[in-house]
Amino acid sequence: MLSEFKRFALRGNVLDLAVGVVIGAAFNQIVNSLVNDVIMPPLGFLVGKMDFSNLYLNLSLTPYASLAEAREAGAPVIAYGLFLNNLLNFLIVAFAVFLLVRQVNRWRPTPPPEPPKTKECPYCLSTVPVKATRCAHCTSDLTAES
């Protein structure tokens, strides 16, 4: 059983997946920092020195000064500012993955085109299989053509 697990764990795609998960976790931290520390502060400044992560809709009748205070009190809230931050995180990650996949696809060699499976009968212009020796439509002999 141990040797079977070793074979499974050392297969190429399992190791690739493990590396991808580790790199993805590190990339997630970079994207979070990019959104929270680089993009959102200037955006908040442009719309009036607003911290997006503290935007929320209070569903209780008691007013609270901040999202943290409302959550600490157990008040029901809709934290749409955090949602906006997470949405921006997702868009950045999705765009980065798109660029990565696009580049990898460019590096892959293009497969050779498949040979045609049909040809045109020179007599009646109908489509017939490439291997046909006689046209099914006009019964012309197609072997002389080859």
Swiss-Prot record:
It is a multi-pass membrane protein. The keyword Transmembrane applies. Keywords: Cell membrane, Ion channel, Ion transport, Membrane, Transmembrane, Transmembrane helix, Transport. This is Large-conductance mechanosensitive channel. NCBIfam families: mscL (TIGR00220). The lineage of its organism: Bacteria, Bacillati, Bacillota, Clostridia, Eubacteriales. One of its GO terms (cellular component) is plasma membrane. Channel that opens in response to stretch forces in the membrane lipid bilayer. May participate in the regulation of osmotic pressure changes within the cell. It is found in: Cell membrane. Belongs to the MscL family. GO terms for molecular function: mechanosensitive monoatomic ion channel activity. The keyword Cell membrane applies. It comes from the Bacteria.
